Design a protein with these regions (language model features):
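Alpha-helical phosphate/pyrophosphate-handling elements in metalloenzyme active cores
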Residues: 2
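Asp-based, Mg2+/Mn2+-dependent phosphohydrolase catalytic module
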Residues: 6-10, 22-23, 27-130
């Protein structure tokens, strides 16, 4: 996963975390994994007065990372992620290997991700070059 994040950053994309986990917990998890600094922003469930599926949660995450909310996409693993992307009017990539597994295909994402190595090409296809 981190190779894909680094490839996206090297190509000029902004990469951030928009999660419904409490911000402190998300920060702790990413820090313990040694990857917190790889993300330009992290917005948790309690960072703002709203959370996913409210699209403003995603938009504010993009802004805090220095990106354009109109040019973002959401990579996720839940029905809430799909609802957030739909509400935001942005492409949605759902992983087939998350908690809901193959059931993600039924949510009709713009792309279904089977391997993080494919993510940079999917991003270019869905939103264009950075």
């Amino acid at each position: 996963a981190m190779a894909a994040v680094e490839a996206l950053k090297a190509a000029g994309y902004r990469v951030a975390v928009c999660t419904n986990k409490p911000e402190a917990l998300a920060h702790t998890l990413l820090s313990r994994l040694g990857v917190r600094d790889a993300f330009g922003a992290m917005v948790g469930a309690d960072t703002l007065a709203i959370r996913k599926p409210d699209p403003e949660h995603l938009f504010e995450t993009a802004r805090r990372a220095g990106g354009d909310p109109a040019m973002c996409l959401l990579v996720g693993d839940t029905d809430t992620d799909r609802k957030t992307a739909t509400a935001a009017g942005v492409p949605c990539v759902l992983v087939s290997f998350g908690p809901s597994g193959a059931d993600m295909a039924a949510l009709m994402p713009d792309a279904l991700l089977d391997d993080y190595a494919d993510l940079p090409d999917i991003v270019v296809r869905l939103i264009g070059a950075a």
